[in-house]
Amino acid sequence: MPSNMKQFCKISVWLQQHDPDLLEIINNLCMLGNLSAAKYKHGVTFIYPKQAKIRDEIKKHAYSNDPSQAIKTLESLILPFYIPTPMEFTGEIGSYTGVKLEVEKKEANKVILKNGEAVLIPAADFKPFPDRRLAVWIMESGSMPLEGPPYKRKKEGGGNDPPVSKHISPYTPRTRIAIEVEKAFDECMRQNWCSVNNPYLAKSVSLLSFLSLNHPTEFIKVLPLIDFDPLVTFYLLLEPYKTHGDDFLIPETILFGPTGWNGTDLYQSAMLEFKKFFTQITRQTFMDIADTATKEVDVPICYSDPETVHSYANHVRTEILHHNMVNKVTTPNLVVQAYNELEQTNTIRHYGPIFPESTINALRFWKKLWQDEQRFVIHGLHRTLMDQPTYETSEFAEIVRNLRFSRPGNNYINELNITSPAMYGDKHTTGDIAPNDRFAMLVAFINSTDFLYTAIPEEKVGGNDTQTGSQTSSLTDLVPTRLHSFLNHNLSKLKILNRAQQTVKNILSNDCLNQLKHYVKHTGKNEILKLLQE
């Protein structure tokens, strides 16, 4: 069996084969994420310095008291663009430093830069996966410029993008809400296992109520993604620990500000209202997509017929696990292919449109696969926590640490821990989970209702799902006793949800009370009096 990869899902895998020392330096400088195409809208290109002198200088500065020079040199070798051939070396192109690259000469297989006089040729042995916008070039001589005029690249919708992704403070309004909820959850778990008041349920319902009342188009976008586990829904909608990029599912301007949600509690009977949102899934008949070819209007199938979506997902599941090569190479690649089809065409087995256009646009660049793996992992950890005979704060803290530092949503591809084909490569990419256990978790994920997830009404949770085997979903039970041991996570999540009985009795309607609460929070009693007089 060959020991070297011939096709690459990551630039880091190629570096591991060619220069593990340089890869280690990049990793030690916390720059590994900069080599991922998921961080940039237009892919990424890495310039590998063939000259030992440059690599030695990087190493010397990296392990000095001030590694800033090494970081700057490495940034000059990273281009936030997909440039596979000399033909693409055109227009406004620059490095991660923000310095513009000026081309002096282009040949069939070579590019010579003016500033720095770098001579670049495409790496002959770097072939990325078809769905990865990655490229590697070899710098034969010269150097990449560290100083010079800046470059500006156009956004697709006009204006200019900054040369690097935005960096957001770790203590954002989203983070503060999450910390508040986590503290409340820990307290109520120690008191009564949150059987009376579940903070995750309260905030999830409140956010969805706010969107439904004030931003119906955003509500339409996120509704197919909600999860029966309020903890899962909370983290997927709020994305509180994301610190890079601006591709939030729900924009900042909607959540915060004078007319924003701002974490306001908006519910009367949290559990009943939460379940009602799932009932609405089959009633959203006004979310239409115009087919670009026929100009006909299509209702997204996640709304018109969610059961059929699950049926098609089950076909994909069966095809993957009945494949004659169920193994650590073929199986994860088939999973990636299924999600790639969904992201690129909004279809499952050519059946679609599955989601509203706004939803699928928000899930591109591997966010959908990241989300579904996140569902699987968060709920598994949550269920394990709830199944313990006694509650330990340290175990819940471990879940939060996992979300905050391993799965914040900064780099979707790099944060895939179960479904990424790269996780089944050599020993350097498998992390701290044994390969066999990881593969068992992958099979369990495929066999779960989290695979190609779309939300369904409560009454549809049982059905045929319950006839295929095990209903367990604790992380300790993830190794199936047989290949098709089915994990009905939706049913498992409902069981946890039904423990919460948050109810506030009042004669006013829910919508009226929610509007009043929001006015109280943001405009004061004078506005409430006006509202009541109307």
Curated annotation (Swiss-Prot):
Q: Give the record's GO CC terms.
A: host cell perinuclear region of cytoplasm; virion component
Q: Where is this site: DNA-binding?
A: 10, 39
Induction notes from the record = Expressed in the late phase of the viral replicative cycle.
The yes or no answer to whether the keyword Ubl conjugation is present is: yes
- Spell out the residues of the site Cleavage: 158-159, 463-464
The organism's place on the tree of life at top rank: Viruses
Please list every transmembrane segment annotated in the UniProt record, as residue ranges: none
Provide this UniProt record's keywords sorted from A to Z.
Answer: Disulfide bond, Host cytoplasm, Ubl conjugation, Virion
Similarity section: Belongs to the asfivirus polyprotein pp62 family.
Q: What is this protein called?
A: Polyprotein pp62
